[in-house]
Each structure stands twice: as C-alpha cells, then as structure tokens.
Amino acid sequence: MATNLKSIAKLQKPIQYDKVIEVDRIFADPAFIEQHRQRILASFKDAKESALYHELTHIVIKDNLFSAAMNEIVSYFEFQINPEELKNVVEGLKRDVVKDADEKTIQSIAEKIIKKALVFNFLQKEWKVEVSDDIVKRVISLYYEKTNQNVREYLDDKQKFEGIRTALIEERMVLETINHFKFHFNLTGQLPS
C-alpha cells in the first residue's frame, strides 16, 4: 500500500457499515479474467479446468463486491488529488496497463487508484490490519509446497519480501472491506440501455 501519498482523503462522516449495498449487475472484463487465468496457470500448471473456472468465478464475484463496497466507502470521504501524483499514475497506466483508452478514461482510472490507496491507508489503520513476517514466510513456504518453484529470492530479498507483505495486506483489506457490509443481489437480467 502506498503510504507516502501527496493526495489527501478526509473522512466527512462515520462510515455506515450496517448499510446493505445493492448489487444489480456483475461486471466481468475479459482482459481481467484472462490476466487472472494466466496468473493461476503460471502458479498451478496442473490446475483442472473446473477448479480454474471456480477460482475465476470467485475472483469476479469478489471484485464486484469489493467495487460496490469501495463505491460506498468513497462517498464518505472528501479528496484532494495532487496533480503531480495524478500525472504520474496516468503516465504509469499509459505505459504499463491501459493502451487503447481515451485520456478521460485513463484519468478516471488514475483517480480511482489514488482514492483506493488513500482509503486503504485510512481503513488499514482503523481496522488495525497487519501482516507479520511469520505470515509472509508461511505464505512463501506454501507457495513452494504447491509449485515446487524456488522461493529463496523472496526470503533473501527485502524488497521482494515486502512486496509479498503488501500483496497480502491488500488481499486482507479487500476481504475486510467486503466483510464490513451486507450485500443484496438484484440481478434481474436487464440489458443496459
């Protein structure tokens, strides 16, 4: 999680975690699904198609619940986005992620990334979410057991070790965010107009 942000988020009122969030659509971006499919196959070469399908379905649902929860949480904050920080994120997106989108879309994605980081920093402190060295080592060991790939570089390289910790904190924050709300699915099957 980015902790040295120049942008600012100010909580305007207490977050109402007892609110039921309405989910009326499930979004599944083909590029997002393919990215996760490749990541899973790279880690678990012998993954059965049914297990892969189950995992991808789980990822899509989790992503949709998280997005709905974040849309709710963000409404409780006021943001001051630092222009230089926004420019850096936009440039990074253009270079590494979003190749064919228009400027307005890229700008919107960049703002969401910054807001998510700011909200995560706030909530991580509020919820006291931490990941110890022992947990990071255990996850690295489990990865080795499942894949038989060399993990020494993750144990010996402080930057890679901290990268694993950051990924684990982010995953815990996603799950905590989802678990703080109740959701109601109202999937009527209507096509967007």
From Swiss-Prot:
Q: Name one GO biological process term.
A: protein folding
Q: What's the domain of life for this entry?
A: Bacteria
Under what name is this protein listed?
A: Uncharacterized protein MG377
**Organism of origin:** Mycoplasma genitalium (strain ATCC 33530 / DSM 19775 / NCTC 10195 / G37)
